[in-house]
Curated annotation (Swiss-Prot):
GO biological process: neuropeptide signaling pathway
Protein name: CalliFMRFamide-4
Phylogenetic classification of the source organism: Eukaryota, Metazoa, Ecdysozoa, Arthropoda, Hexapoda
Organism in which the protein naturally occurs: Calliphora vomitoria
Family the UniProt entry places it in: Belongs to the FARP (FMRFamide related peptide) family.
A single Gene Ontology CC term: extracellular region
Primary subcellular site in the record, as a coarse category: secreted
Coiled-coil zones: none
Length: 9
């Protein structure tokens, strides 16, 4: 899910 990319940090 690309939406979870914001939680990669």
């Amino acid at each position: 899910k690309p939406n979870q990319d914001f939680m990669r940090f």
